[in-house]
Amino acid sequence: MKRRTPPDSPLLFDTVPLVPDFKLELKARKAGHWPVAGADEAGRGPLAGPVVAAAVILDPKRIPEGLNDSKQLSAQRREELFVQILATATVSIASSSSTRIDETDIRKASLDAMRRAICSLAIPASYVLTDGLDVPPGLDCPGQAVVKGDARSVSIAAASIVAKVTRDRMMARAHNVFPDYGFAAHAGYGTAQHRAGIEKHGPCSLHRMSFRPLRKGEDGPEMDELIPE
């Protein structure tokens, strides 16, 4: 007889579509931790621009409908949910520039941005749920790293949307300063258009020089100068 795979096996877990919910937050609350924040980042893979992190504490009575991993949503739907999240939740955003990424590495820069976002929440979190494998060091509260967290926790999903929309807006603003690379179209990812721009014009000050295939860049404005008001 063929052996059946347990229902909680990693194989089935990876193949069954997940819908984020509030169960992890309620579990933390039952353990005495409240409020609970979700945290996520956007922009680990691009060749240019910052990595942006967001931390979100949702109001259980005002959770926007349709929260999901930002990558599963259209740009229009992300924008709609972004507005709703800002109107109903406690939100904090932080970023690490391309310079910071080059000085350390993308993992450390991402975790540092996430730490600063969490620590800057107007309402201090009692517990944090983070997407991925790591909880940022240096927090004032305990936390839990959740693999595929943006597909499991609505708080992490909300943070993923805030981080993604914020970063996309920053890169659209960057396009106005550096129009030769098409940042508004690809947000700094290594598309054919972007690589062609680098080949023709060389890198600018927003490029991550520690990422292949980049070389020494030019002077120019830092990403903080491009954050939309």
From Swiss-Prot:
Enzyme class name: hydrolase
InterPro entries: RNase_HII (IPR022898), RNase_HII/HIII (IPR001352), RNase_HII/HIII_dom (IPR024567), RNaseH-like_sf (IPR012337), RNaseH_sf (IPR036397)
Biased composition (Acidic residues): 220-229
EC number of this enzyme: 3.1.26.4
One Gene Ontology biological process: mismatch repair
Subcellular location: Cytoplasm
CDD domains: RNase_HII_bacteria_HII_like (cd07182)
Cofactor note: Manganese or magnesium. Binds 1 divalent metal ion per monomer in the absence of substrate. May bind a second metal ion after substrate binding.
Binding site residues for a divalent metal cation: 40-41, 131
The UniProt record lists the keyword Nuclease: yes
Reactions catalysed according to its record: Endonucleolytic cleavage to 5'-phosphomonoester
UniProt cross-references to SUPFAM superfamilies, sorted A to Z: Ribonuclease H-like
Names of required cofactors: Mn(2+); Mg(2+)
Domain RNase H type-2: 34-223
Main subcellular location of this protein, as a coarse class: cytoplasm
Record function comment: Endonuclease that specifically degrades the RNA of RNA-DNA hybrids.
Entries under PANTHER family matching the protein: RIBONUCLEASE H2 SUBUNIT A (PTHR10954), RIBONUCLEASE HII (PTHR10954:SF18)
Family in the record: Belongs to the RNase HII family.
Name of this chain's protein: Ribonuclease HII
Organism listed in the record: Rhizobium etli (strain ATCC 51251 / DSM 11541 / JCM 21823 / NBRC 15573 / CFN 42)
Lineage of source species: Bacteria, Pseudomonadati, Pseudomonadota, Alphaproteobacteria, Hyphomicrobiales
